[in-house]
Amino acid sequence: APKVLYQEGESETAIYAVRSAGINPATGEEGFIKKNGAYTLVYDSNDKVVVGDETPVLEGAILPMLSYKGWSLNLSMMYRFGGQVYNLTRAINVENVNPRHNVDRRAFDERWKKVNDIPPYLDIANADSRTSIHTSRFVEDDNTLEVKTITVAYEFNPELLKSIGFKRLRVSVGMNDPFRLSTIKYERGTSYPFSRGFVFSISPTF
């Protein structure tokens, strides 16, 4: 990922990278835009400028709860809109991957191969030597809506429980991270293992 930089007057969560002029369909080379606006084929880290900000414009939580005739549904939802991220999955695991190892299929299927190709990724040749290049091609808008937890429960009618000696009986099933909708496609669980889990519970009262 690009190094964290701090400049007077800029956000502390600003993303700094060299602006990309895109991939030349004729040669497969990436062009860059220098600080002064000139175009070049030579990458220079001194040309890094602010190309995004990780702080979202809008961020929050939605906690809806519905109930009907003993049934209840609880959701915990998070949303964020208006920020940007540097997509490390695309930068490291697709474009700059070591071709001698197992790779994402996009590294082969969506790369530049011949004249007039207009792909999202550079030629895989010498890919593992480009890891220190940070360009705006990998900065993406981060608009995300995710359901963190969902719980469905049912509480039995107390009148029906008297015959078995219960005053109350509630059963529930829950799941974490069941749904995620995002403008960004990236690998999850690289810094901390990602997993989905189910929880089933029975809560009797005698």
Where are the language model's segments positioned?
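Outer-membrane beta-barrel "beta-signal"
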Residues: 150, 154, 194-206
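Membrane-embedded beta-strand positions of outer-membrane beta-barrel proteins
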Residues: 75, 171-173, 202
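Outer-membrane beta-barrel pore domains and translocons
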Residues: 67, 78-80, 174-178, 205
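Flexible, surface-exposed loop regions and adjacent strand-edge segments
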Residues: 1-4, 90-99, 184-194
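Extracytoplasmic gating/loop element in the C-terminal half of outer-membrane beta-barrel translocons
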Residues: 25, 80-169, 175
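Repeated loop/turn-to-beta-strand initiation elements of outer-membrane beta-barrel proteins
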Residues: 70-75, 159-162, 198
